[in-house]
């Protein structure tokens, strides 16, 4: 597809949804191609790489389409970071909400760097923020300018499926997060 969506067709692909013509029409085009909803690209060796979901695309105020997962995947490997949600739909630039790792990564980092451990304390600690900024800067050096994170906020709580930010399979509920953290998101656009 022109928009980067992965489409598949062949004898191994289902012909449609069982007893659901409506879902079949939504998923299959008139030529029989199954629209997966995944965004993909082909690398230099000819391998297909999934880079995000079509429904998760952000469109900046300049009309640029951004797959947030691609940027998030460059930042998330840092020991401090548990979750990250890149935002910027309809905005001039991208920002991010960052949640510290509550499964031991942040605690271990705090011990190694002589920082008092608590999610609340660390979210405000300049040493922690500087370490995350370094990771963001490294990620920014690997992507196009339009994909770069200009600002971020470290949140003082963890995201879970029970608190509403994650699905039971621990995927981000982007719309819920945008609603719950609207104030924090808007604060990143007030001065820039």
Region spans (language model):
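Conserved adenylate-forming
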Residues: 1-3, 11, 92-93, 100-114, ...
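Conserved ATP-binding/catalytic segment of the ANL
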Residues: 1-60, 77
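Adenylate-forming
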Residues: 13, 28, 47-76, 105-126, ...
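Generic, well-ordered alpha-helical scaffold segments in large soluble proteins
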Residues: 20, 27, 39, 74, ...
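C-terminal boundary motif of the adenylate-forming
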Residues: 39, 77-104
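Conserved C-terminal "lid"/linker of ANL adenylate-forming enzymes
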Residues: 83, 133-192
């Amino acid at each position: 597809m022109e928009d980067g969506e992965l489409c598949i067709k062949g004898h191994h692909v289902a012909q449609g949804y069982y007893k659901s013509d409506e879902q079949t029409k939504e998923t299959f085009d008139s030529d029989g191609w199954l629209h997966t909803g995944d965004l993909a690209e082909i690398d230099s060796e000819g391998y297909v790489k999934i880079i995000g979901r079509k429904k998760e695309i952000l469109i900046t105020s300049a009309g640029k389409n951004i797959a947030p997962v691609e940027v998030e995947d460059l930042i998330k490997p840092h020991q401090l970071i548990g979750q990250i949600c890149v935002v910027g739909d309809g905005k001039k630039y991208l920002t991010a909400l960052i949640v510290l790792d509550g499964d031991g990564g942040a605690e271990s980092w705090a011990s190694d760097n002589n920082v008092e451990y608590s999610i609340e304390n660390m979210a405000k600690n300049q040493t922690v923020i500087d370490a995350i900024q370094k990771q963001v800067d490294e990620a920014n050096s690997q992507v196009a300018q339009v994909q770069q994170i200009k600002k971020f906020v470290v949140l003082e709580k963890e995201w879970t499926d029970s608190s509403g930010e994650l699905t039971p399979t621990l995927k981000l509920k982007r719309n819920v997060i945008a609603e719950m953290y609207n104030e924090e998101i808007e604060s990143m656009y007030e001065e820039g």
